[in-house]
């Protein structure tokens, strides 16, 4: 899980999800692409 000020999709499989006001990126193909804004 990377914590970044600006989250961007790294690959085509990355999805932007908003949970409890926190923007997250989840990726099925590569779990290393997981990110959280903060």
From Swiss-Prot:
Keywords annotated in UniProt: Ribonucleoprotein, Ribosomal protein
GO cellular component: cytoplasm; ribonucleoprotein complex; ribosome
Biological processes, Gene Ontology terms: translation
GO MF annotation: an example: structural constituent of ribosome
InterPro entries named among the record's database cross-references: Ribosomal_bL36, Ribosomal_bL36_sp
Family as reported in the entry's similarity comment: Belongs to the bacterial ribosomal protein bL36 family.
Protein name: Large ribosomal subunit protein bL36
């Amino acid at each position: 899980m990377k914590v970044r000020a600006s989250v961007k999709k790294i690959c085509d499989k990355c999805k932007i999800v908003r949970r409890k006001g926190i923007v997250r990126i989840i990726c099925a193909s590569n779990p290393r692409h997981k990110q959280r804004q903060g």
